[in-house]
Amino acid sequence: MKAYKGMLLTCDAAVKQLILSLDERNRFIIMDLDETHLLISPDRIDWLRAELEVELEKNTYTLEP
C-alpha cells in the first residue's frame, strides 16, 4: 500500500483531456484515477488554474465587431 499527497481534481472528460495535454509539458499529475478524477501535485494547483483559464479562453467564441 502506498500513500500519496495530492489534491483530488474532478472535471468533465473534455477538461481532463486538456489537463492531460498540459501535463505533457509540465508533469504535475500524480495519478489518473478514472474518466473524471485526477490526483495532482498540490503545489501546482495555482499554476494549473491559470493555464486552464488561458486555454479555455482560447476556445471561447466572442463576437467582435
Curated annotation (Swiss-Prot):
Oligomer status and interactors: Component of the 7-subunit TFIIH core complex composed of XPB/SSL2, XPD/RAD3, SSL1, TFB1, TFB2, TFB4 and TFB5, which is active in NER. The core complex associates with the 3-subunit CTD-kinase module TFIIK composed of CCL1, KIN28 and TFB3 to form the 10-subunit holoenzyme (holo-TFIIH) active in transcription.
Main location: nucleus
Cited SMART domains: Tbf5 (SM01395)
Entry function: Component of the general transcription and DNA repair factor IIH (TFIIH) core complex, which is involved in general and transcription-coupled nucleotide excision repair (NER) of damaged DNA and, when complexed to TFIIK, in RNA transcription by RNA polymerase II. In NER, TFIIH acts by opening DNA around the lesion to allow the excision of the damaged oligonucleotide and its replacement by a new DNA fragment. In transcription, TFIIH has an essential role in transcription initiation.
Family stated for the protein in its record: Belongs to the TFB5 family.
Lipid metabolism keyword on record: no
Stretch forming the signal peptide: none
Stated name of the protein: General transcription and DNA repair factor IIH subunit TFB5
Pfam families: Tfb5
Location relative to the cell: Nucleus
UniProt keyword Flavoprotein present: no
GO cellular component: transcription factor TFIIH core complex; transcription factor TFIIH holo complex
InterPro entries reported for this sequence: TFB5-like_sf (IPR035935), TFIIH_TTDA/Tfb5 (IPR009400)
GO BP: any one term: transcription by RNA polymerase II
Keywords: DNA damage, DNA repair, Nucleus, Transcription, Transcription regulation
Domain of life: Eukaryota
Disulfide bonds: none
